[in-house]
A protein has these predicted regions:
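Extended, loop-rich substrate-binding clefts of extracytoplasmic carbohydrate-active enzymes
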Residues: 69-120
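Acidic-aromatic substrate-binding/catalytic surfaces of carbohydrate-active enzymes
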Residues: 13-71, 226
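Acidic, contiguous internal or C-terminal segments within carbohydrate-active enzymes
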Residues: 8, 15, 19, 100-149
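Short strand-coil-strand connectors
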Residues: 9-11, 31-33, 62-64, 119, ...
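Active-site/ligand-binding surface loops and adjacent short beta/alpha elements
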Residues: 135-137, 144-212
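Short, charged beta-turn/beta-strand-edge "cap" motif at the junction between a beta-strand
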Residues: 66, 72-74, 131, 257-262
Length: 262
């Protein structure tokens, strides 16, 4: 069993996957241009078994109130798998599969799998959560940090959400849906026809983030990077919109990045 870095190539595209650093995508290079912010905490990390913040780190699991560590006090953020070591199940020139077994502090055993597939103009990731025992609520999503500037001007973010989740003082959705507001964002949006966000680096590259999932968090309040995060439910969704993983029904999502030079 190995968790050494994996390099995938197709055409002039190259992806590095880092199983040993939380199962994150460490690099996406197109030609000689790096699209992801570099650094141990950056790249693109998996959010699982929840996305964004859980209010006070607590969620109802059947009749049991579960408490997660408050890693973003007073809340718990972005799941546990990004802090663990994943294992490589298989790898080839342009495809790889890695897995992670859920352990404490998450209260239930389960397995998370990510499948990565690279072509010369697209990169697709599928993530699933399976249980062999108890059913439990879970979410999956991804948190990429795209470099704001690739050398020729700041990225433009274009998308047409149906609504924005109103954000409360505690940083969590209030439950009200509002008209989408202009940037700056650290906000969750509803896209009922599927996530479809276009990033344009003027004169260089256009990249589309697409998913059949209906929720996306967009975060552009940092100077170095912009985050476009497809996910299976909104922040605090383990409480507000719980979706169960059962022995016959995994939670699964797919995200595709596709690009073209300008």
């Amino acid at each position: 069993v190995s968790n050494e870095d994996i390099t995938l190539t197709a055409g002039d595209a190259e992806v590095t996957v880092t199983p040993g650093n939380g199962g994150r995508i460490g690099s996406l290079r197109i030609g000689d241009v790096e699209l992801l912010r570099q650094g141990h905490k950056f790249g693109c990390f998996p959010m699982v078994p929840w996305c964004g913040r859980i209010r006070d780190g607590r969620f109802l699991d059947g009749a049991t109130l579960q408490q997660m560590p408050l890693n973003a006090p007073p809340h718990a953020i972005h799941g546990t798998a990004r802090d663990g070591a994943w294992r490589t199940a298989r790898t080839g020139k342009s495809e790889a599969v890695i897995t992670y077994d859920l352990v404490a502090p998450w209260p239930h055993p389960g397995r998370v799998t990510q499948l990565f597939t690279l072509t010369e103009d697209a990169f697709t990731v599928t993530m699933s959560v399976e249980t062999y025992e108890d059913s439990f609520p879970a979410q999956v999503g991804w948190h990429p940090w795209f470099n704001r500037n690739l050398g020729q001007g700041d990225v433009q973010v274009d998308f047409t959400p149906a609504w924005q989740e109103e954000r409360g003082e505690d940083h969590l959705p209030t439950g009200h849906r509002i008209e989408p507001k202009p940037s700056p964002w650290d906000d969750c949006f509803g896209m009922p026809d599927g996530v479809d966000v276009t990033l344009t680096w003027p004169g260089q590259l256009e990249l589309k983030v697409a998913s059949r999932e209906q929720w996306v968090v967009v975060y552009d309040e940092q100077e170095a990077a912009v985050c476009v995060e497809p996910q299976t439910g909104p922040p605090n969704g383990l409480n507000t919109r719980p979706r169960l993983v059962t022995p016959i029904d995994p939670v699964e999502a797919t995200m595709t990045w596709s690009w073209r030079r300008l």
